[in-house]
Amino acid sequence: VAVKTPHQNVTFESSGTQAHGYLALPESGKGPGVIVIQEWWGLTDHIRDIADRLAAQGFVALAPDLYGGAITHDGEEAGQMMSQLPEERGAELLSGAVDYLLASESVTSTKLGTIGFCMGGGFVLQLAAQQGEKISAAVPFYGVGQGVPNDFSGVRAAVQGHYANFDDLYPVADAKAQEEQIRLESGAEVQYFYYDGKHAFHNDENPAGNYDAQLATLAWQRAVDFLRQKAS
């Protein structure tokens, strides 16, 4: 669902290097901040659209480019690109994005929300574990193993997960075990929703052929309501 909002490509510091991202602003120019974390395909039009849709809901949304401009629509190539991204480098880029947003005059919140899909779902949880009090809401959509921390004790954010019962990349049993691990190790508010769909059911570009409009609409509304409640 394409939404037009004020947006721009931005550059920010990350561990002494230049990083890039896509920034979408609400019409007012100000709002609570949200980090949007890409899938293994790269910083695609779909991820930009997610940022635009969040901006239309009143958020300042930044989607960092974890691949340095590379994009693919081929599953095998995407898997290679994901495996070639060191988790430490991904974490550094996201840490720089957090600092950039929190320092922005456009951001009205003192903490940030974060939402991510596929690979980005794993990095959402890593970001919450590493950044502690800076992240107030973490929303992973069908996160895979990439980027997921071993220890969730640093999580201070409320967590809302969206996972598929028929996910061939991340079994639902693993998601349920992860949900319980986060709850036990962090003491945070954790709620995972499980949908009768497949991996990437929310991606309306449909590169995997698994898009489900009804499930996507339900999950998106839950996520937006949660971010509005926890990240404002």
Where are the regions a protein language model picked out?
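Conserved hydrolase catalytic core segment
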Residues: Q126-S136
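Serine-hydrolase catalytic machinery in alpha/beta-hydrolase-like enzymes
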Residues: V1, H7-V107, H202-E205
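Short beta-strand/loop motif that positions the catalytic acidic residue
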Residues: V155, G161-Y163
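Alpha/beta-hydrolase fold nucleophile elbow
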Residues: S106-F117
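C-terminal catalytic histidine-bearing segment of alpha/beta-hydrolase fold enzymes
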Residues: E185-S232
